[in-house]
Every structure is written in structure tokens, then in C-alpha cells.
Amino acid sequence: MSCHVLERLEEVIRQRIREGNPQSYTYRLYSSGLHNVARKVGEEAVETAVAALAEGEERLVQEAADLLYHLLVLLAAKGLALADVCKELERRMK
């Protein structure tokens, strides 16, 4: 099974940032600045690790999804894309 949903999610994130709707969580997070976005990624990473150690599989999957979403927002905040990460992963597999 492929995970094209990450590419679609990345596009939704970029669209929400472009639209600048203050009702959008994505836009509010992005607008709060790089420091806050990075802090949120850290929080989600810890929650994912805790879920892996102390909670069930369903909770782990939920936290992993949150982490991936916030990581995509962080990449967008730095002007990077999922494709940049994929290229690096491919380079490492050679």
C-alpha cells in the first residue's frame, strides 16, 4: 500500500497557509512562528514515543499521524517539502 495521502496532506497544508484563514489550525500554527512549530513537533514526537511504550496500537497510530502532520507543517515553514525528505531517504538507501 502506498502512502500518497502524505502528498495530499502536504498540498492541503500549503493551501491553508496560502489562504491565510485565521480559523484554520494549520494557518494559526504556521503563523505562530518556526519556534512554536518546532516545539509542537517535539511534543508530538514525545507523545508518539509514550504511546509506543505505554498505550495500544490504535493510540500509537493516532499519535504517529499527528507527528507526521506537524512535521509537514515544519517542513513548509522552512520552505521544504516531503519530496526533499524522500530524496534524502533514497540517497541513503543506495
Curated annotation (Swiss-Prot):
A cellular component term, taken from the record's GO annotations: cytoplasm
GO terms for biological process, alphabetical: L-histidine biosynthetic process
Subcellular location: Cytoplasm
Pfam families per UniProt: PRA-PH
UniProt superkingdom: Archaea
InterPro entries: HisE, PRib-ATP_PPHydrolase-like
Protein name: Phosphoribosyl-ATP pyrophosphatase
Organism from which the protein derives: Pyrobaculum calidifontis (strain DSM 21063 / JCM 11548 / VA1)
